Curated annotation (Swiss-Prot):
ATP binds at residues 8-15, 34, 123. It is found in: Cytoplasm. Keywords: ATP-binding, Cytoplasm, Disulfide bond, Nucleotide-binding, RNA-binding, Transferase, tRNA processing, tRNA-binding. The lineage of its organism: Bacteria, Pseudomonadati, Pseudomonadota, Gammaproteobacteria, Methylococcales. The active site is at 99 (nucleophile), 195 (cysteine persulfide intermediate). It comes from Methylococcus capsulatus (strain ATCC 33009 / NCIMB 11132 / Bath). The record marks 124, 342 as: Interaction with tRNA. It catalyses: S-sulfanyl-L-cysteinyl-[protein] + uridine(34) in tRNA + AH2 + ATP = 2-thiouridine(34) in tRNA + L-cysteinyl-[protein] + A + AMP + diphosphate + H(+). This is tRNA-specific 2-thiouridylase MnmA. Residues 94-96 are annotated as: Interaction with target base in tRNA. Belongs to the MnmA/TRMU family. Catalyzes the 2-thiolation of uridine at the wobble position (U34) of tRNA, leading to the formation of s(2)U34.
């Protein structure tokens, strides 16, 4: 008898086709819908009811039992509190990565086991392969949808219990399968925004939880250009929302966020998408995780590729451990808008090696100080 697989059903097309494919492969399939956010009183941003209705329609069409679970408390404690603390410290976090680590592949897996699951499955565009007795996390075959960047914190035990049926497919193929199966969500828009919280006016949302500290907007030379509403609302390389136009000296070229001076509460801006101060030669990262459970040896210099944000092309680099949980990354070419709080994820060809959280960035002339 084929194993029992519990599929994370979100109401979207990816999880729906995941369940469809597993049924066609002969697995015994159940669905599990997660509700992880309860803070909004009204329905302004609420899509959970529609998502559940879509998941229910798909499961009924497939003849699959759909369970529901509320992980709102776990999400608040393990994901959202960390999200807020990172913004409070002036960094820009990636909650999707933490959500995968703490909710989708920990709390969900534990609950699925209580339902009698042998395996779980998710609609992520990624693959798992075995090499010399260890499991590898591989990129999805659709380069525009590959989600391995968000999955680098997965452990061997989690990979061994997880199926990614969409890893070898392109998004167009997934939508075609959904349409062929008669799913009403075959053309449903991909979810965006904060994991499980969704799309919303981010500035208004963040202000509900963190007090803003307005301050000056200045050029690197110290010229005062205006006022910002709070450093937490801005990220490196950002163009829109600055509220400043051209200057007599600088012309009408757009302004970009170059730095956030936390000590002085100053937003540093400059003109030009490729302003030199937006580029860094390297970074230091911590909170490291290696998919194979080992990673490079202390002192070893590993040449590989890295991404410092989702959908970035692979960037050649060399990495070395400089402490038990700290890593130095030096890029072959300077990188634009490398942002503390985001994750740097490492690859060799299609294989995701692991990654960590960016602590700070440096240029070659300041490397000694950074280390």
């Amino acid at each position: 008898m084929k194993p029992h697989v519990v599929v994370g059903m979100s109401g979207g097309v990816d999880s729906s086709v995941t369940a469809l494919l597993l049924l066609r492969q002969g697995y015994r399939v159940s669905g599990l819908f997660m509700k992880n956010w309860e803070e909004d009183d009204g329905t302004e941003y609420c899509t959970a009811a529609q998502d559940f209705a879509d998941a229910k329609q798909v499961c009924e069409r497939l003849g699959v039992e759909l369970h529901t679970v509320n992980f709102a408390a776990e999400y608040w404690d393990e994901v959202f509190e960390v999200f807020l603390s990172e913004y409070r410290a002036g960094r820009t976090p990636n909650p999707d990565i933490l959500c995968n680590k703490q909710i989708k592949f920990r709390a969900f897996l534990d609950y699925a086991e209580d339902l009698g699951a042998d395996l779980i499955a998710m609609g992520h565009y990624a693959r798992v392969a075995e090499e010399e007795g260890r499991l590898q996390l591989l990129k999805g075959c659709d380069p525009g949808k590959d989600q391995s960047y968000f999955l680098y914190t997965l452990q061997q035990e989690q990979l061994a219990r997880t199926l990614f049926p969409l890893g070898g497919l392109r998004k167009t193929e997934v939508r075609a399968l959904a349409a062929g199966a008669g799913f009403a969500n075959d053309a449903k828009k991909d979810s965006t925004g904060i994991c499980f919280i969704g799309e919303r006016r981010f500035k208004d949302f963040l202000a509900r939880y963190l007090p803003a500290r307005p301050g000056d907007i200045r050029t690197p030379e110290g010229v005062l250009l205006g006022r910002h509403d709070g450093l937490m609302y801005y990220t490196l390389g950002q163009r829109s929302g600055l509220g400043i136009g051209g200057t007599r000296a600088g012309g009408q070229e757009p302004w970009y966020v170059l730095d956030k001076d936390l000590a002085r509460n100053v937003l540093v801006v400059g003109q030009g998408h490729d302003h030199p101060l937006l580029y860094r030669d390297g970074l230091l990262a911590s909170r490291l995780h290696w998919v194979d459970g080992a990673g490079p040896a202390p002192g070893e210099i590993l040449r590989c590729a890295a991404k410092t944000r989702y959908r970035q092309s692979d960037q050649d680099c060399r990495i070395r451990l400089i402490g038990e949980d700290r890593l130095e990354v030096v890029f072959a070419q300077p990188q634009r808008a490398v942002t503390p709080g985001q994750s740097v994820v490492f690859y060799q060809d299609d294989c995701c090696l692991g990654g960590g959280v960016i602590d700070l960035t440096f240029n070659a002339d300041s490397r000694a100080d950074a280390a």
